[in-house]
Structures are given as structure tokens and as C-alpha cells.
Amino acid sequence: MTKPTEEELKQTLTDLQYAVTQENATERPFSGEYDDFYQDGIYVDIVSGEPLFSSLDKYDAGCGWPSFTKPIEKRGVKEKADFSHGMHRVEVRSQEADSHLGHVFTDGPLQEGGLRYCINAAALRFVPVADLEKEGYGEYLSLFK
């Protein structure tokens, strides 16, 4: 995958998608289209299309952002120390496009490993199960059998 140029990204992404993925912005809580959204499918990086999260691992954390217990594949995301805003957090970025996705916290469901991947909806695109094969994500159909 070759990451699109800054100019290409500005032409294809909304202002919010660009600010979140390229400038590490955070969308307002409870404003993203996937916060209260529970259809079966996968969530991919809005920039590169790389698979990130499954709806099977999504839950309502009540925080205002889509929350997941884990990524589809651990190697699909990278974590980075974030000391911005006077806090110490762990930032989550996509592996290939290096898009800012959100942060991971240790206050998730204990029975699922205790992690909460708090992700900006603006960094994601949802691919429903019915479209996985057609859009090139057929290998993930087995998650939903």
C-alpha cells in the first residue's frame, strides 16, 4: 500500500477525517456515526482500507466513541506513547497508513482482556458482512460463521 499524498487525502477525506487521521484530532464524543452502531461487519482504516476491528469485539463503553476489546489482528495497529494534553496515554495508529485512530485504555471488560480501544469514528469505514467478499475482505467472513 502506498499512502496517498497530503493533497490526495485533502481531496478524498472530509475535514474531520483529515484532522483526525493526519493531525491527531479527536472528534466530539457521541458525534461519530459508529458510536451507537451495531451491524455485523468489519471496520477498516478510512485512509488505506486496512482491516482494523470487528463488530464482534465492539461494545458500548458509554464514552461517546466506538469502543472495541481488541483489533482484528494485533499487528494491524501500532501503539505509541502519547503525552499530549498533560496526560500519559497510549495512542493507536494504523500500521500501513499510520493514521491516528484513537487511544487504548486498560478499563475495558475484564472477561475480554481488560482493554478498551477508544476509536474515532471519523478514522473508520464500516464494511458489512454482506459486502466483505465483494470489497476484498472475504478472508474475514469466517469471523461471522
From Swiss-Prot:
PROSITE patterns per UniProt: MSRB
Query: GO: which molecular function terms?
Result: peptide-methionine (R)-S-oxide reductase activity
- GO terms classed as biological process: protein repair; response to oxidative stress
Outline the inducing conditions. Answer: By cadmium, lead, mercury, copper and manganese.
Which Pfam families does the record match to this protein?
Answer: SelR
Q: Which UniProt keywords apply?
A: Oxidoreductase, Stress response
Catalytic center at which residues?
Answer: 118 (nucleophile)
Looking at the record's lineage, which domain of life comes first? Bacteria
What chemistry does it catalyse, as a reaction equation? L-methionyl-[protein] + [thioredoxin]-disulfide + H2O = L-methionyl-(R)-S-oxide-[protein] + [thioredoxin]-dithiol
Q: What class of enzyme is it?
A: oxidoreductase
Q: Which SUPFAM superfamilies match?
A: Mss4-like (SSF51316)
Oxidoreductase found in the keyword field: yes
Q: Which residues form the MsrB domain?
A: 6-129
EC number in record: 1.8.4.12
HAMAP family attached to this UniProt entry: MsrB
Q: What name has this protein been given in UniProt?
A: Peptide methionine sulfoxide reductase MsrB
